[in-house]
Every structure is written in structure tokens, then in C-alpha cells.
Amino acid sequence: MSVSPATVTVMEVSPRDGLQNEDALLSTEQKLQLVQHALNAGCKRIEVTSFVHPKRVPQMADAEALCAALPARSDVRYTGLILNGRGYQRLRDTCLDEAGLVVPATDTFGQNNQGLSAVSYTHLRAHETRSY
């Protein structure tokens, strides 16, 4: 019995994860260029932004504008990261194909990233998710 998966899907995350901690704010156009480079390289799944409060992650303040400007591609799946129900509501109003949800594995990460322990965050998001 093989433990290897039949397929592996690679998701490009640089437009979101690669930019979220940068001090210099990139314009929406610069982010679109980064997405276009990923498309030109053959990426078929791209995490383009995060739907978080702009004060928490200023680099993602243009999430909706970025999504509205993405090139329509039937062969590509665009993803956005959410941390809570408000983020999901914002994502639903865009053209994105998927929502990614971070679930912290440790209390330290949970406190630093979401402001909750891993268990508290998981219970809260499970309850929220059932409502959708």
C-alpha cells in the first residue's frame, strides 16, 4: 500500500504570504503584476490576498480591488485567506474560487496570529463555519 498521494497540487502564496509582512506597501497594480508572473510561470492555484482588517495587515487593505482586477481564467483557481466570518463575508462578494482558513496548531501561534488559543480558535471557527 502506497502512502503517496495520487496527485499533488501546488498553490502559489507569494501574493498573500510573501507580501503580508512587507513594510513597503505595494500598489494593487504591482500585486497584479506578481499574480501575472505566477500565471506566466504556469501556476494554476494562487492565494492572492487575505481578508483581514487593514489595520492588522495594511498590505491586504486592497483585497476587494485586487480581486476585481484579477484576469478571468477558467484554468486557474484563485484563493483568499480568511481568519473569521467577517473575512468570509468579504471573500464571498468577490470572484475568488476558494477560501483558505488557517487553523493554529499551537497556542503560541494562535495567540500571535489570531489572538486566541488553538483550542478556542478551533471551537469558535467550527461554530462559525456551521452557519455557512
Residue ranges and their predicted role:
Residues G18, A38, L91, A99:
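Conserved, mostly hydrophobic/aromatic
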Residues R45-L66, P104-L116:
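Glycine-rich, proline-tolerant flexible connector loops at the mouths of alpha/beta enzymes
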Residues P15-Q30, Y78-N84, N112-G115:
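Active-site mouth loops of central-metabolism enzymes
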Residues S2-D23, G100-N113:
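N-terminal small/glycine-rich loop or linker at the start of catalytic domains
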Residues V8, C43-K44, S74-Y78, D97:
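Short, well-ordered coil/turn segments that N-cap beta-strands
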